[in-house]
């Protein structure tokens, strides 16, 4: 009986240590998500693109996009006077995988963007980001952004 109780205590201690480890991973991940979203909302191009893994895949506007081309387009839009005026995330759901180094974050996005000619566009969308801890840093390995049609 003592062996069983001792084994049970060892298992429970292991789970406790894993929970503490995942707690710090979860805090780091939430900080990365918040910083990534804030960088986009404030037109901080380099911080925003710094969160993408080198081989990340992104999908928006109905097609897979090249991250380098996306970076160039966004930089050019900022230099020409365009930019994001609003990018609010809501209903954030984060699922940290048991391994602790992969997570899926989903949220609704309310966006308002100004083109260089001053035209304002608004969108409501659903975004899914797949994050992976690479060399100790959380990076986006895949992002899928889908517009939600407005109800008129």
Language model features with spans:
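Sec-dependent signal peptide recognition
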Residues: 2-10
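N-terminal signal peptide c-region/cleavage motif recognized by signal peptidases
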Residues: 14-16
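A solvent-exposed, acidic/Ser-Thr-rich amphipathic alpha-helical stretch
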Residues: 23-32, 45-101, 108, 122
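Short helix-adjacent coil turns
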Residues: 36, 43-44
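Short beta-strand segments enriched in hydrophobic/aromatic residues
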Residues: 52, 109-111, 144-147
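Beta-strand elements of well-folded, non-transmembrane domains
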Residues: 111-115, 131
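Short beta-strand edge/turn micro-motifs at domain boundaries
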Residues: 124-151
């Amino acid at each position: 009986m003592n062996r069983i109780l001792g084994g049970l205590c060892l298992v429970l201690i292991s789970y406790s240590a894993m929970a503490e480890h995942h707690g710090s991973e979860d805090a780091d991940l939430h900080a990365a998500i918040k910083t990534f979203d804030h960088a986009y909302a404030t037109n901080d191009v380099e911080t925003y693109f710094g969160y993408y893994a080198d081989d990340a895949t992104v999908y928006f506007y109905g097609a897979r996009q090249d991250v380098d081309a996306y970076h160039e387009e966004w930089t050019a839009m900022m230099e020409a006077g365009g930019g994001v005026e609003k990018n609010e995330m809501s209903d954030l759901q984060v699922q940290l995988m048991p391994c602790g180094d992969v997570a899926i974050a989903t949220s609704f996005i309310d966006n308002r963007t100004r083109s260089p000619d001053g035209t304002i566009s608004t969108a409501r969308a659903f975004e899914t980001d797949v994050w992976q801890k690479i060399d100790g840093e959380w990076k986006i390995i895949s992002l899928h952004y889908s517009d939600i049609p407005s109800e008129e």
